[in-house]
């Protein structure tokens, strides 16, 4: 499996990981062969690149939980980007409470480990995925420590927002 930038994709290449849209809807299943329209779609979707299987490489196993994590992470990246843009533009954070409750409900009662081994595609990906992974970890730890719900919300919010200065410094440099 190797990462291939969107501009270097060719028809016939097989996807190693699924591609989801910002709502978590599956666009392309893993092991799907790319087509010219699929490549154009990936470019329009704003993907920096995708993971491709080598021609003779078998499809590596992925657990249902890993696939769900990949899907949720894609949704969370778009939601976090929207939240941080609202903050930057001084707009009301109407969707933030739903986003926060989604993280708390998915990871606040989880009794098993989460595989945070993920693939970063850009500095943008790094910031968003790092903030989301930190928020998930904080949520899991806080729940394990039986922190009150309000403290858990505060900690998870801090984990999601603490890197916003890093994002803004990249924009203005």
Which stretches of residues belong to each language-model region?
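Terminal helices and disordered tails flanking the catalytic cores of nucleotide-processing hydrolases
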Residues: 1-100
């Amino acid at each position: 499996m190797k990462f291939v930038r969107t501009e270097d994709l060719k028809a016939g290449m097989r996807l190693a990981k699924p591609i989801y849209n910002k709502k978590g809807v599956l666009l392309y299943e893993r092991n799907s062969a790319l087509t010219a329209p699929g490549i154009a779609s990936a470019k329009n979707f704003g993907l920096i690149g995708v993971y491709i299987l080598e021609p003779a490489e078998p499809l590596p196993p992925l657990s249902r939980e890993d696939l769900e994590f990949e899907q949720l992470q894609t949704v969370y990246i778009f939601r976090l980007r929207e939240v941080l843009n609202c903050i930057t533009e001084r707009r009301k954070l109407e969707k933030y409470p739903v986003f926060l409750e989604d993280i708390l409900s998915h990871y606040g009662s989880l009794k098993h480990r989460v595989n945070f081994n993920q693939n970063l595609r850009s500095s943008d990906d790094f910031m968003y995925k790092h903030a989301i992974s930190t928020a998930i970890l904080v949520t899991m730890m806080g729940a394990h420590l039986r922190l009150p719900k309000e403290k858990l919300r505060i900690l998870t919010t801090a984990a999601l927002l603490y890197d916003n200065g890093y994002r803004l410094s990249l924009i203005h440099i």
